[in-house]
UniProtKB/Swiss-Prot annotation:
InterPro entries: SAM-dependent_MTases_sf, UbiE/COQ5_MeTrFase, UbiE/COQ5_MeTrFase_CS. One of its GO terms (biological process) is menaquinone biosynthetic process. This is Demethylmenaquinone methyltransferase. The gene is menG. It holds the Pfam family Ubie_methyltran. It catalyses: a 2-demethylmenaquinol + S-adenosyl-L-methionine = a menaquinol + S-adenosyl-L-homocysteine + H(+). Methyltransferase required for the conversion of demethylmenaquinol (DMKH2) to menaquinol (MKH2). Its EC number is 2.1.1.163. S-adenosyl-L-methionine binds at T74, D93. Pathway: Quinol/quinone metabolism; menaquinone biosynthesis; menaquinol from 1,4-dihydroxy-2-naphthoate: step 2/2. PROSITE patterns: SAM_MT_UBIE, UBIE_1. It is an enzyme of class 2 (transferase). One of its GO terms (molecular function) is demethylmenaquinone methyltransferase activity. It comes from Chlorobaculum tepidum (strain ATCC 49652 / DSM 12025 / NBRC 103806 / TLS). Belongs to the class I-like SAM-binding methyltransferase superfamily. MenG/UbiE family.
């Protein structure tokens, strides 16, 4: 069973097909919030707050800022962004099961279903685009970032949170032991979709980090892109300005 799970995860890493990613998140939706908070020891909420605080500072003076949260999942980052005064937030995700939970949790936020690489929004529609722990799952990362850029207003910013593999050798070793050996076993106790938690560490390892990802953002058209490691470099916030 474990071998099959790991093989499924490796296959998903290689293809990143939209339908497979959607099916995976549909499967994990019932336990997603519980496991996210458990496996991150609750620190994931802090990371969202950091992103929302930076967005709030950017939006000072905007009376009705429009915010798009892509790969919104069950809506937690969208909800953090919705605390910004006057904000109108739209959550957007490919998984109908995740969105069903988001709508129950946050009935005052609009949630729409679709793919990030081709979004149904007009050019220059949003002051902020955010994404928490989702862009590494895009089938076409470069195209997804071009869409982020397209729908942002001039001067608008993208705020993207992703897991990070620590650069410190000791922290990196401990992190990978936890991610690859401990995390999947804990997840397997609560979730039927064990391959999703074999997929997670592999997807983080495959994702371009720090300078490599800011280069992708600049290639997508952003005039400025920077990053902020958080919590001993276990997570990272990217901020890109159009």
């Amino acid at each position: 069973m474990m071998s099959s799970s790991k093989e499924t995860a490796k296959s998903l890493i290689q293809t990143k097909s939209r339908s497979s990613i959607r099916n995976m998140f549909d499967e994990v939706a019932p336990t997603y919030d519980f496991l996210n908070h458990l496996l991150s020891l609750g620190i994931d909420n802090y990371w969202r707050v950091v992103a929302a605080k930076k967005a709030r500072k950017q939006l000072e003076g905007e009376r009705e800022p429009k915010i798009l949260d892509v790969a919104t999942g069950t809506g937690d980052l969208a909800a953090s962004m919705a605390k910004i005064p006057g904000a109108k937030v739209t959550g957007y995700d490919l998984s109908p099961e995740m969105l069903a939970i988001a709508r129950k949790k946050y009935p005052n936020i609009e949630f729409l279903e679709g793919f990030a690489e081709k979004m149904p929004f007009d050019d220059r529609s949003f002051h902020v685009v955010s994404a928490g722990f989702g862009v590494r799952n895009f089938e076409d990362l470069a195209q997804g970032m071009k869409e982020f850029h397209r729908v942002l207003k001039p001067g608008g910013c993208a705020y993207i949170i992703e897991p990070m593999i620590p650069r410190n050798a000791v922290m990196k070793k401990l992190y990978l032991i936890y991610f690859k050996n401990v995390l999947p076993k804990i997840a397997g106790m609560f979730s039927k979709s064990t391959f999703a938690y074999d997929y997670l560490p592999n997807s983080v390892e495959q994702f371009p980090q720090a300078e490599a990802f800011t280069k992708i953002l600049k290639n997508a058209g952003f005039k400025k892109a920077e990053y902020f490691p958080m919590t001993f470099e276990t997570s990272i916030l990217y901020v890109a300005m159009k």
